[in-house]
Each structure stands twice: as C-alpha cells, then as structure tokens.
Amino acid sequence: VTEKKTWETFFDAHAPVYEENVFTKNTVREVDFLLEELSLQPGASILDVGCGTGRHSIELAKRGYDVTGLDLSSEMLARAADAASAAGVNVDWIHADATQFILPRKYNCAICLCEGSFGLLGQGEDPIDQPLSILCNISRSLKPQAMAVLTVLNAASMLRKHTNEDIAKGRFDPLTLVESSECPPREGLPAIAVRERAFVPTELLLLFRLAGMSVINMWGGTAGNWGRRSLDLDEIEIMVVARKIAEPLAPGGSE
C-alpha cells in the first residue's frame, strides 16, 4: 500500500481508542455465537478480514483455532499483535487491503465483522466493485463448502434516518446507499471525510452469488446483540451466513 487510503488513515488514527467503543465489549458472546453458527472442527483455519485490533481473532485463537487476521491499518495490527502476545496466542497478522489481497492458502471459514472493510468506501471507490472485490477475495481464500459470516450496514436503518435535505447536501446518496460524513480532527490529525455503504438483502444475495457463495441465513447483526432473529428496519447491521459453492464469477483483487 503506497499512498494511504482514507480508511487506513482513519483506523491508524483511531487504533489507540478503538476498543473504548461500546460495540467492542461483547467479544466472548459474539465468538460463542459464531461458533454455534459455523460448526467448525477443532483447530480449523479461520480468516478474519478487517480484523482491526484482533478481538475476534484472539478469542478464536484462545479456543484453539488457526487464525489469520488481515487489516488495512498497520496501527490496528500493531495493537492486535501486542494483545495476542499478552494473551499467549499465535495469530498470523497480514497488512493488506481487503479489496486486493491474494493469500497462499485456503481456509475452513472466513469472517468480516463490525464494518470490517465491506462497504467502507475510499474516495473514488465504486459502491458495487468495492464490496464485490472483497467478497471474491474472501471466496478465493476458502476451501470448497467453507462458510463465511459477514456483518454489513443495513440500508433500511440508514434510509430511515436521512431526509431529502441530506440528499441535497450530499450527506446521503439514495442511488448508491452511500452515506458521506466527516470524522472530526483529533491529536493533530485533520478531519477525515469518509463514505459508508449500506446494503439491502436482495442485492447481498446477488453479490454473494457472483462471488461463488450461497446465502444460508440473514440475521439481525447489530453489534452487541447478535442472534438468530429476523431482520427488522432498525437493525444497524445485517449478519450474512453463507457457504462457498463455486469459484467467483467476478474478477477479484490483484497482488
């Protein structure tokens, strides 16, 4: 990664305070739920895309899984590596862009959670190509019939909070379901303009299909409240549970 991407700058800056966010406080319960959904064999290999400070990766490694954590932010990964050492577990940390990675091995499972790259658009990134590239790269990293769990922003919830004035002022684009906002400056860093993409369930079915994956379930996936319950209009995130059934139809990232 040569020039820093918008979200790389954002997460590098927020790495020191990331785990102060309230949504990071339910890791053990979230991993319990993931393992119920995934039915993995002991020691199975897991790829965590957009692993951040490694809270899910480390908890999975504590339970004996073979975990690789991939993230765009070197600062987040540095904190993840420190936390893994403190916990006495080994995780393979990889600094890479989720839209462009190719890995040398295949995994039993992949996770991409809590806005872990999917739909976090850099300036100029296409609102369809970005998530599709990530899905295809995840799919290529999976063994046949392997499972994937992603949480993505729920368009129904995003739509309900925006007005026509937001559209006129460029804060929300109803054609692409992209929300534009500015993160305030902190610790000498300038304000950072960010773009977040939300999704509707029908397009998720199509995107996953293009990536060679079949969607098994979609649940309400708001952080801190995961469970096998129907999606409603107020869920901040959708949890998608899918299985790899074919190689991706669409082109993925490059090295």
Residue ranges of predicted features:
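Class I SAM-dependent methyltransferase "Motif I" SAM/SAH-binding loop
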Residues: G50-G54
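A short acidic, Gly/Pro-enriched loop at the edge of an enzyme's catalytic core
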Residues: I102-C109
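A conserved beta-strand element that flanks and buttresses the S-adenosyl-L-methionine
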Residues: I111-L113
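A short glycine-rich, Lys/Arg-flanked "PGG" loop and its adjoining helix->strand segment in the class I
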Residues: D129-P144
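SAM-dependent methyltransferase
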Residues: Q145-A211
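C-terminal lobe and adjacent flexible extensions of AdoMet/dcAdoMet transferase-like proteins
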Residues: E203, L207-E255
